[in-house]
């Protein structure tokens, strides 16, 4: 479940690349934590919600969303026209970008189980990263979900 933080970090990075404020980014991180918990509880037995409020949960998520390589690369993606492979090559010095791989795997899982609608942030991040949806579309998500959370 720890890999899901990298997907959320893509969303946080889109916020940074667009120059959005801290409140928007914090809203994305908050929604992301909720979707991480829901995903793990939906698909893995024995998951305890309190785990997400420990160092391995929220603390790791915050660190990744505010300083990790997935955030950094997503910021570059949102800021201007490079493909993921170019960004990875130019910014990571041989390291791999895990968030994009995990994002694709998560979406494959959700589609196969008919659960995409239950994970609007994961779906939006996938749309931006792989389906050509503009990064600016991340901005409308927190307001659209406020009545559901």
For the regions a protein language model found, what residue spans apply to each?
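NAD(P)-dependent Rossmann-like dehydrogenase/reductase catalytic/cofactor-binding core
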Residues: 5, 9-27, 33-37, 41-149
């Amino acid at each position: 479940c720890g890999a899901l933080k990298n997907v959320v970090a893509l969303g946080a990075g889109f916020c940074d690349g667009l120059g959005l404020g801290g409140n928007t980014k914090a809203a994305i991180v908050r929604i992301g934590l909720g979707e991480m918990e829901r995903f793990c509880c939906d698909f893995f037995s024995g998951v305890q919600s309190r785990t997400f409020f420990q160092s391995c949960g929220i603390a790791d998520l915050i660190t990744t969303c505010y300083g990790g390589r997935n955030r950094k690369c997503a910021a570059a993606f949102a800021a201007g026209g490079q493909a993921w492979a170019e960004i990875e090559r130019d910014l990571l010095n041989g390291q791999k970008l895990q968030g994009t791989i995990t994002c694709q795997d998560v979406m494959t899982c959700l589609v196969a189980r008919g659960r995409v609608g239950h994970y609007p942030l994961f779906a939006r991040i996938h749309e931006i990263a792989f389906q050509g949806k503009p990064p600016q579309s991340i901005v409308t998500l927190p307001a659209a979900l406020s009545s559901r959370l």
